[in-house]
């Protein structure tokens, strides 16, 4: 029977509904097939927590998840220092989760085996030191950046992306930083 309990929101997103999640057990179709989860986040903010313990429980459900790729979520940015370098904290955080995973204490999967961070490409050439610092902080795991270009005139729809400029992709400084971001191709 479906749950009719209303969703609650204690942070940026709706809170997990354990009653709803428990309604269906997913069948493991091919438990021997190796899987890399290509996109996940970790955070502890606004009363909501999803860290390595929660991820390990989710990927340890019977599927053969052998590795994961962490994708930036504006999580664990540095609280101080130059604004441009604050996203470096998220790469350091994801690399720390990868080190925890390497201990074997969270299951066999290589959690955060790949890391996708963020650099403000509107900085143009000034984004280069950020990218270089993220490559170092990723300890061989850094794979690229994500600079969201989502935009909507309605702040209610745009949510946390409401501050993004309209028409971001053709902005000259944004495009100028792209060659620096391709260094590791």
Whereabouts are the PLM-identified features?
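Helix-coil boundary/capping segments in enzymes
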Residues: 2-185
């Amino acid at each position: 029977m479906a749950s009719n309990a209303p969703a609650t929101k204690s942070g940026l997103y709706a809170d997990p509904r354990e009653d709803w999640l428990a309604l269906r057990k997913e069948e493991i179709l091919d438990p021997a097939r190796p899987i890399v989860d290509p996109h996940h986040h970790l955070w502890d903010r606004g009363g909501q927590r999803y860290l390595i313990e929660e991820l390990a429980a989710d990927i340890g459900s019977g599927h053969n998840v052998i590795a994961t790729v962490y994708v930036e979520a504006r999580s664990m940015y540095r609280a101080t220092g130059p604004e441009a370098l604050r996203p470096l904290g998220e790469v350091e955080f994801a690399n720390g989760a990868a080190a925890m995973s390497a201990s074997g204490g969270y299951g066999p999967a290589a959690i955060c085996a790949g890391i996708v961070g963020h650099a403000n490409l509107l900085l143009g050439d000034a984004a280069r030191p950020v990218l270089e610092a993220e490559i170092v902080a990723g300890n061989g795991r850094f794979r690229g950046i994500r600079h969201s270009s989502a935009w909507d005139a309605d702040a209610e729809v745009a949510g946390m992306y409401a501050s993004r400029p309209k028409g971001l992709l053709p902005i000259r400084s944004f495009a100028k930083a792209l060659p620096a971001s391709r260094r590791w191709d």
